[in-house]
């Protein structure tokens, strides 16, 4: 396998994560949906459903990625996410049931499929810069929310100019295209590959420290690190 410039992986990761930030841009649609007769609880239900499917499918994606490969999983996520928004637009953009299914369930599932890929691939291509690459990928996820809020709202005024239906349709096409393009670079490096000049760290006893020792789900749940990280996320999300 020919080893290409690994920074293309970063480009692909950022493109994918920018599109996936759509889930946190949902609030920009709330005023228009309320004007169309929705209650605040209905808008929150779609968002909560999206987060639920995002979390559940993300676990599934992590399990199937070694078998199918990261490119297929990320592109599947792009197709599912984009299709969800496209269908939401085609069904009028204001139907609660349609948006709950197409954006909450299908869109959330698409985000879950694609989310794990850039981080997993990026860390394998950059064992020497894991923190940097993970930070860049996740920051794209956060910035994507701001980008889509501004595009639909104050910058692009898509909702004001074209309405919810057209906005959902346009965003669906954009999300699908961005993730499909970014997915082109989502492949793992060759087995045993390391960047030039990088050597695996050495433990105090002289043995090489590698990333080959993996925990299964049961073993992971028994580690104190898992529970500490879970508490950190729980308190952070609550804040």
Pin down the residues of each PLM region:
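Glycine-rich segments within core transmembrane alpha-helices of 12-TM secondary carriers
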Residues: 126-150
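Helix-loop-helix hairpin linking two adjacent transmembrane segments in secondary transporters
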Residues: 141-191
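Extracellular/periplasmic helix-loop-helix junction of adjacent transmembrane segments
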Residues: 25-58
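Intracellular juxtamembrane helix-capping segments at the cytosolic ends
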Residues: 33, 111-126, 133-134
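C-terminal ends and interior cores of transmembrane alpha-helices
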Residues: 79-93
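Pair of pore-lining "gating" transmembrane helices in MFS-fold secondary transporters
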Residues: 3-25, 219-239
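Helix-to-loop junctions at the C-terminal end of transmembrane segments
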Residues: 57-70
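Hydrophobic core of transmembrane alpha-helices in multi-pass small-molecule transporters
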Residues: 18, 84, 96-113, 234
